[in-house]
Each structure stands twice: as structure tokens, then as C-alpha cells.
Amino acid sequence: MRKRISAIIMTLFMVLVSCNSGGVAEDPKTVYLTSIANLGKGFLDVFVTFGDMVAGAFGIKADTKKSDIGKYFNDIEKTMTTVKKRLQDEVAKNGNYVKVKEVVDKFVADVLDKIAAGAKKQLRATGDAAIGMLLNEDAAPAEVASVNSLVKGIKEIVGVVLKDNEGDAAATKTADAEKKSVGKLLGKGAADGTETQAAAASASIGAITGADILQAIAKSGKAGAGEIKIEEAKNAAEIAAAKADSKDLAIDSAKKDAVIAAGIALRAMAKDGKFAAKNNEEKSANAVNGAAASAVGKTLSTLIIAIRNTVDSGLKTINEALATVKQEDKSAEATNPAEATTSGQ
């Protein structure tokens, strides 16, 4: 009798083990949705990187090297590549969820790839010198190819991360006389680049937003291959590449605070670009350097924040697609309980 009871108990135990083994097997759908839903945690380091870049951009000084500016763009490109790879790797493991794959593919093509391509164009455009200048150092035009590369790359990124109503390329608030005098920061005379002229440049930079500067760069035409005279400069690129000459800005399209700030930022970042400062006057050199550093810092910090916000928005869109897939799956199971039961075993 005991043997029969033992046999029955053993049989029941085996049945229970068999049932439970089917019950604990993880549903591939659930595994995929959970892994993607938790993917946001995997991007924490990405947003830490963005935070570091923003903090660094706010800390740009006159002695910051142009090559350090190039590193920001290199970091942007690498960050976009990292996000792209993580998303594509996860989708490749679970290719059955077409809706999610479509959203991811669109985000990669329309956002990540374009930002990466724009950032890549900046890598060789910056040079090794400091963005500011030394006491009694001569002004020098920025290399045309370098300026045009910066304009093209920033334009590509701005087209992705800023809406048309974000920033005004023609924004202007300061007096006409002040704006004209900024041309003297590019001059070669011993008295060019005074503290007063630097203050006029700083006023232009302070009067507008970083988005205004970015739009002025994005909407700037190219700097021509020939010698560019400051009094003939029409846009930010031409201000950046204008030859060292003691002239005022004269063309109306260039006498806009946003365009002036953009031209200063481009000249400071691009190869060979230097500003004038009154000879043997340290306060003027400091004022000019402060204006250059301010223009670059405002431009880069705004750009990086806009990229971060765009990436964050894209990841949220992917999460919204996941929520739709989950709801659809539940609805399908509710209308076909037999199939749902089979898939759970």
C-alpha cells in the first residue's frame, strides 16, 4: 500500500514539475518588449555625456584650443553612433515587431545619421591654436575651406534639431553705429580692436539667443574663394573669412546682431581665424577674447542642448511605439484566447 501511495505522489510531483516548467518559460514577446522598454536605462551614459559637453561649452575661455572645439563635434558623432548601434542591435535580435522597427529606422535615418554627418564635417575645420589671441598678436582671416565646412556641418545639424520658428537669423537689437564698429575687431591697425569695439561685439552677442546664432550660421552663404573685404561681407561666413583690414561693416545683411555673433563664433572656431586688439593694451585684448569665447560658448551650448533634446524626444517616440505594440498584442490575445493559451505553453 505504501509503495502505491509513494508511486502516486511521485507521479503527481512529475506532473507538477512538467506543468511548471512550461509556465516559467519566458515568452519571447515579453522578453523583447521588456528589453526594449528598459533600453532607456542603457542610454543614461549618453545623457551624462551630453551633460558633460554642455558644462564644457559653458566653460569655454579664450585659451580654449580650436582643437577642443573639434573634440565636441567628434563626441557628438560618436554619441550618435552609439545610440544607433544599441537600437539597431536590439531590433536585430527581435525583428518580428515591424512597427517598432519602422520607428527605430526612421529615427536613425532622419535624426542620428544626419547629426553624425553634420558633426563629422567639423572635425578637420578647427585647427590647433586658441580661440582667443595674445597681446599684440595680429588679426587674421579664417581659412575659407574651414569656415565653409563649419557652416555646412552646423546647417545639417540645425535642420534636424531646430524648428523653423526657433531662432531668427536676422535678429538684431543694438544700434547701427555699434554694429558697424565690430568690423574693426578684424582690422590690422595698431589701434584696432579697442575695448569699446569689443563691448559692441559683446552687446550683439548678448542681445540675441544661441538659436539666433545657429540660424544665422545655417542660413549663411559660403565664403568665396577670393579675398573678402570686411566692408563687402554679406553674411556670417564672410565676416569670419574677411581679410584683416581697418574697415566698418557696411552691408545691411551683415549688420545684424545674430549675423555678427555668428561671424565671430565661426572666426574663433575656424582654422587661422584671429581678432585684433589694440597694441600694448591688455584690457582691450581681454575684452576681445571675452567676446570671442562668449560667442563660441553660446553657439555650442545651444547646439548640444538642442541635440540632446532631439535624441530624448526620439527615444520617447520609440517608447510610445512600444506601448502601441503591447496594447495591440493584448487585444489580439483577447480576441483569440486559444492562440494565446497555446503561445503561453
UniProtKB/Swiss-Prot annotation:
A lipid is attached at residue 19 (N-palmitoyl cysteine). One of its GO terms (cellular component) is cell outer membrane. Keywords: Cell outer membrane, Lipoprotein, Membrane, Palmitate, Plasmid, Signal. Residues 1-18 form the signal peptide. It is found in: Cell outer membrane. It is a lipid-anchor. PROSITE patterns: PROKAR_LIPOPROTEIN. A lipid is attached at residue 19 (S-diacylglycerol cysteine). Belongs to the variable large protein (Vlp) family. Delta subfamily. Genes for both Vlp and Vsp families are on (usually) unnamed linear plasmids in B.hermsii HS1. The Vlp and Vsp proteins are antigenically distinct proteins, only one vlp or vsp gene is transcriptionally active at any one time. Switching between these genes is a mechanism of host immune response evasion. This is Variable large protein 23. The gene is vlp23.
